[in-house]
Amino acid sequence: MADWLIGLIMGAVEGLTEFLPVSSTGHMILTGHLIGFDDERAKVFEVVIQLGSILAVVVIFWKRLWSLVGIGKVTDGPSLNLLHIIIGMIPAGVLGVLFHSTIKEGLFGPGPVVISLVAGGILMIVAEKFSKPSTARTLDEITYKQAFTIGMFQCLALWPGFSRSGSTISGGLLARVSHTAAAEYTFILAVPMMVAASGLDLIKSWDVLSSADITLFVTGFVTAFVVAMLAIVSFLKLLSRVKLTPFAYYRFILAAVFYFFIM
């Protein structure tokens, strides 16, 4: 298969699934297996195109991101600030640094991914069932305690297949944050976390990069960026109506597909 076509397919899958609660890792592994793109080069490629998805968040939330560093206040009164982000980053950041190699070596196989797809789906259903009325209906109403709770749930996303947005939005609901506010906080929180993780992976895999792969990488990056832009905007509109439960059932179906076609 031509490099540009691989880049187009994988970039579209990455952009569509990175910020939806369905596990981008699971979809990337499955898609790579189906099109025969699952070698060492594929692992580096996935890191690069993930940066395209991150750029989409930066573009959509650029005013918010600027306000976090004190440039251009978004709203009067109390608002989301840099400390909210730092607090949310700490739990997963510490675990990620301490267990980066263990996670990469032990949890990226088909078996662990199937388990986390199911477990993540169950968590989402439980969060919907037992969540109480929101005390933080907007991003600016999130407290430091709620930010830390969401950050704790983000630790689950270190297990491939759990889904960052699935685990953090679920944590937000259980902490009495609305669906939309939890999702927006999740996306903003993902920027420093994903940049750090992707940067570390790129440094470790730098010797695998080759100028011969430029078509593959550029096509994948651009496609992931464009599709992620559309996916994020659509998801935020959809989430207030359909909640997390349909995504949970989809995860169960994906786990079954994984079990029969990959394992």
From Swiss-Prot:
Q: Which reaction does it catalyse?
A: di-trans,octa-cis-undecaprenyl diphosphate + H2O = di-trans,octa-cis-undecaprenyl phosphate + phosphate + H(+)
**TM annotation in the entry:** 15-37, 42-62, 79-99, 107-127, 142-162, 183-203, 216-236, 242-262
Q: Name one Pfam family in it.
A: BacA
Gene Ontology cellular component annotations, sorted alphabetically: plasma membrane
Q: What does the record list as GO biological process? A: cell wall organization; peptidoglycan biosynthetic process; peptidoglycan metabolic process; regulation of cell shape; response to antibiotic
Annotated keywords: Antibiotic resistance, Cell membrane, Cell shape, Cell wall biogenesis/degradation, Hydrolase, Membrane, Peptidoglycan synthesis, Transmembrane, Transmembrane helix
- What molecular function does GO assign, one term? undecaprenyl-diphosphatase activity
- Highest taxon, organism lineage: Bacteria
Q: Which InterPro entries match?
A: UppP
EC number(s) for this protein? 3.6.1.27
EC class name? hydrolase
Q: How does it sit in the membrane?
A: Multi-pass membrane protein
Where in or outside the cell it occurs: the entry states: Cell membrane
Miscellaneous: Bacitracin is thought to be involved in the inhibition of peptidoglycan synthesis by sequestering undecaprenyl diphosphate, thereby reducing the pool of lipid carrier available.
Q: Which family does it belong to?
A: Belongs to the UppP family.
What is the stated purpose of this protein?
Catalyzes the dephosphorylation of undecaprenyl diphosphate (UPP). Confers resistance to bacitracin.
According to UniProt, the name of this protein is Undecaprenyl-diphosphatase 2
Organism source for this protein? Bacillus cereus (strain ATCC 14579 / DSM 31 / CCUG 7414 / JCM 2152 / NBRC 15305 / NCIMB 9373 / NCTC 2599 / NRRL B-3711)
